[in-house]
Amino acid sequence: IGKQKEPISGERVQSMLYNHMQERSAVADALLPSRNVGIVWNGAGALPYSTWAVGVFNDWLDADEDIDESATQYIGRLTWAPLRTDDDSSLLHLGIGYRYSNAKGGFRFRTEPEFNQAPAYVDTGFDVPTGILPANNIQTVNAEISWRRGPLWLASEYTQTAVDNPDLSHPTFNGYWIGASWVLTGEMRPYSKKSGTFRGVPVAKSVYQGGKGAWELSARWSSIDLSDGTVEGGDMDIASLGVSWWLSPIFSINMNYRYIWNTRLGVEGSSSGFNSRLLLLLE
């Protein structure tokens, strides 16, 4: 109970500190809210390595409104790892999530090009005075798949959001990402069968113990389309490359390069950027 992550999307549920790239994908930031005020129930499924989670949320606290004036969301997620070796060194993960919102207060979907301090490149409300568009309800479906074999990890997610508003021609927005990472030093991302998520790269021997730490190479392609019906929010594709060096389990140096293709109202453009980050975990 409280302000917490909504149970949808493995990328959203797991800590961003353990993502293979510095920032979450554009589609996750645009269509899948991070934290909300609500109640979540979760547990192990009937099958081995399966989980379930359901939640009810209402953002009245952040919006400073009465509960009956703010949007209410009903959310659920199911995961299962149907294929795995006895030692879990090879594992296939599947997940599906659903989100329903009564959309009180309307909607606005937007996101930056996977650089936290950049402006929004796609935005459903950029040409609306208030930025907010009305809707009767909003339904979102998310599908996830991941495969890990030793130090190799491949993953992908697809998200689709349907808006019920005949005046906007019932627009549907969608996006996906495909990612991969390879831990050069041989460590393997652990899998949590309790939450149905992958955790961060462990460090076999830190540099402070005379080791090399853990080195990870990563790549991702992401795409989002916020133009449909009468809404022209634009579309964006992003290619990303990254390298991370975990000197110890709590300290890392990582660098990401991204190339972005962006189209809105028939105007096409491209840009690129490089970002470095020092990460220190304090517990």
Walk through the language-model features, giving the residues of each:
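Outer-membrane beta-barrel pore domains
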Residues: 3, 90, 98, 108-283
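Outer membrane beta-barrel
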Residues: 1-104, 173-209, 216-229
